[in-house]
Amino acid sequence: MAKNVVVVGTQWGDEGKGKIVDWLTDHARGVVRFQGGHNAGHTLVIGANEYKLNLVPSGIVREGVACYIGNGVVLDAHHLLSEIRTLEAGGIRVRDRLRISPGCPLILGYHAALDRAREAAKSAGDKIGTTGKGIGPTYEDKVARRALRVYDLFDRERFAAKLRANLDYHNFVLTQHLGAEAVEFGSVFEQAMADAEEIRPMVADVSAELYAVNKSGGSLLFEGAQGTLLDIDHGTYPFVTSSNCVAGQAAAGSGVGPGRLHYVLGITKAYCTRVGGGPFPTELDIETADTPGQQMSSKGREFGTVTGRKRRCGWLDLGALKRSIIINGVTGLCITKLDVLDGLSELKLCTGYMLDGRRIDLLPMGSEEVTRCEPIFETMAGWSGTTFGAQSWEALPQEARAYLHRIEEICEIAIDVISTGPERDETILRRHPFGA
């Protein structure tokens, strides 16, 4: 019987979703991206090979698995083709296994120009920390009903007319408001037309194909990008991304009915990280040697896959995690990077906050309120043994098991999967999301 699983990040992204999606793909006929764009960075370690993906779903490294880019994704076609060529150079078949929705809004040259110019114009405290890849401006065009979509690529005259209208508008903003250079029509148009011919064979009715997979008994895996706390509606606004990153978006962003989403796996690091600006209640110093924050940063290799920026690190925030569990309807948790905490003498869990003199247990909405939150910590014993590469619950140090049990108790949810390293087999399974 077909069973569909949604994988979402419960923090500020970078939770290790790519490895888990790859690991789960053994039980899926297809993997689906449903939001975001090439601002996502998923790193997979398969034997001696490391793959860094932005747009192509993580299931692509599994032979025979179909991959889908749903209508909720904003698509930089030129970047996608570059990513495909890199994978093909490594011996991975892509083009006959990848399907792209014709409804994807297109990221074009002026979107990235707007993104960079706006960020440059902001004062230091107001900077979002955008990747500068044009994601936000493209979603703006979609909501304003002026976006060019994949299906527009295949009508040259229509595409040219819409592009001219968009450039008239956006070049005015770039030159008159932001003091940046205008984007030239010819270069954008010719690049888009060249890319169109190359992606045309991969464009398909993704919604209908996903329905057909389920109807024939095949299961699907929906791969979220970024994380719940970066969601445009539910995140620490305005320090968020421009898409919905939550489980509910899997339906809208791919064209499947919500009743066909059967299990939601919430991916959670054993600590917290954040890239870019915005409030972070449990943040630690990552620069001072021999401190917990510095260990998380260095041992966890906490650098952005897309930007290369050093990630901010802090203790696990259960108030934020509980908020994410509620929003996503999480069925079970997957804890990643537990091994990064090996060797710390004590650990802290944020169990709530003091906000304006009163205790609250859930992360509030809006960055202003989150900034005023003072974390309430519970201290637990660390462990001297190693969790790295553990493949069974019994192989974990007693203190590590106690740490995980406490997360389950406070969040009132089961930890179904534990990742203890980057390789596929460095995983502890307690309950399989696909019911296998």
From Swiss-Prot:
<dbReference type="InterPro" id="IPR042111">
    <property type="entry name" value="Adenylosuccinate_synth_dom3"/>
</dbReference>
<comment type="similarity">
    <text>Belongs to the adenylosuccinate synthetase family.</text>
</comment>
<keyword id="KW-0460">Magnesium</keyword>
<feature type="binding site">
    <location>
        <position position="311"/>
    </location>
    <ligand>
        <name>GTP</name>
    </ligand>
</feature>
<keyword id="KW-0342">GTP-binding</keyword>
<dbReference type="InterPro" id="IPR001114">
    <property type="entry name" value="Adenylosuccinate_synthetase"/>
</dbReference>
<keyword id="KW-0658">Purine biosynthesis</keyword>
<keyword id="KW-0547">Nucleotide-binding</keyword>
<protein>
    <recommendedName>
        <fullName>Adenylosuccinate synthetase</fullName>
        <ecNumber>6.3.4.4</ecNumber>
    </recommendedName>
</protein>
<feature type="active site" description="Proton donor">
    <location>
        <position position="42"/>
    </location>
</feature>
<dbReference type="GO" id="GO:0044208">
    <property type="term" value="P:'de novo' AMP biosynthetic process"/>
</dbReference>
<feature type="binding site" description="in other chain">
    <location>
        <position position="309"/>
    </location>
    <ligand>
        <name>IMP</name>
    </ligand>
</feature>
<dbReference type="InterPro" id="IPR018220">
    <property type="entry name" value="Adenylosuccin_syn_GTP-bd"/>
</dbReference>
<feature type="binding site">
    <location>
        <position position="41"/>
    </location>
    <ligand>
        <name>Mg(2+)</name>
    </ligand>
</feature>
<keyword id="KW-0479">Metal-binding</keyword>
<dbReference type="GO" id="GO:0046040">
    <property type="term" value="P:IMP metabolic process"/>
</dbReference>
<comment type="function">
    <text>Plays an important role in the de novo pathway of purine nucleotide biosynthesis. Catalyzes the first committed step in the biosynthesis of AMP from IMP.</text>
</comment>
<feature type="binding site">
    <location>
        <position position="145"/>
    </location>
    <ligand>
        <name>IMP</name>
    </ligand>
</feature>
<keyword id="KW-0963">Cytoplasm</keyword>
<dbReference type="InterPro" id="IPR027417">
    <property type="entry name" value="P-loop_NTPase"/>
</dbReference>
<comment type="pathway">
    <text>Purine metabolism; AMP biosynthesis via de novo pathway; AMP from IMP: step 1/2.</text>
</comment>
<dbReference type="Pfam" id="PF00709">
    <property type="entry name" value="Adenylsucc_synt"/>
</dbReference>
<dbReference type="InterPro" id="IPR033128">
    <property type="entry name" value="Adenylosuccin_syn_Lys_AS"/>
</dbReference>
<feature type="binding site" description="in other chain">
    <location>
        <position position="131"/>
    </location>
    <ligand>
        <name>IMP</name>
    </ligand>
</feature>
<feature type="binding site" description="in other chain">
    <location>
        <begin position="14"/>
        <end position="17"/>
    </location>
    <ligand>
        <name>IMP</name>
    </ligand>
</feature>
<feature type="binding site">
    <location>
        <begin position="13"/>
        <end position="19"/>
    </location>
    <ligand>
        <name>GTP</name>
    </ligand>
</feature>
<dbReference type="GO" id="GO:0005525">
    <property type="term" value="F:GTP binding"/>
</dbReference>
<dbReference type="InterPro" id="IPR042110">
    <property type="entry name" value="Adenylosuccinate_synth_dom2"/>
</dbReference>
<feature type="binding site" description="in other chain">
    <location>
        <position position="241"/>
    </location>
    <ligand>
        <name>IMP</name>
    </ligand>
</feature>
<feature type="binding site" description="in other chain">
    <location>
        <position position="226"/>
    </location>
    <ligand>
        <name>IMP</name>
    </ligand>
</feature>
<feature type="binding site">
    <location>
        <begin position="337"/>
        <end position="339"/>
    </location>
    <ligand>
        <name>GTP</name>
    </ligand>
</feature>
<feature type="binding site">
    <location>
        <position position="14"/>
    </location>
    <ligand>
        <name>Mg(2+)</name>
    </ligand>
</feature>
<feature type="binding site" description="in other chain">
    <location>
        <begin position="39"/>
        <end position="42"/>
    </location>
    <ligand>
        <name>IMP</name>
    </ligand>
</feature>
<dbReference type="GO" id="GO:0005737">
    <property type="term" value="C:cytoplasm"/>
</dbReference>
<dbReference type="GO" id="GO:0004019">
    <property type="term" value="F:adenylosuccinate synthase activity"/>
</dbReference>
<feature type="binding site">
    <location>
        <begin position="419"/>
        <end position="421"/>
    </location>
    <ligand>
        <name>GTP</name>
    </ligand>
</feature>
<comment type="subunit">
    <text>Homodimer.</text>
</comment>
<keyword id="KW-0436">Ligase</keyword>
<dbReference type="GO" id="GO:0000287">
    <property type="term" value="F:magnesium ion binding"/>
</dbReference>
<feature type="binding site">
    <location>
        <begin position="41"/>
        <end position="43"/>
    </location>
    <ligand>
        <name>GTP</name>
    </ligand>
</feature>
<feature type="active site" description="Proton acceptor">
    <location>
        <position position="14"/>
    </location>
</feature>
<dbReference type="InterPro" id="IPR042109">
    <property type="entry name" value="Adenylosuccinate_synth_dom1"/>
</dbReference>
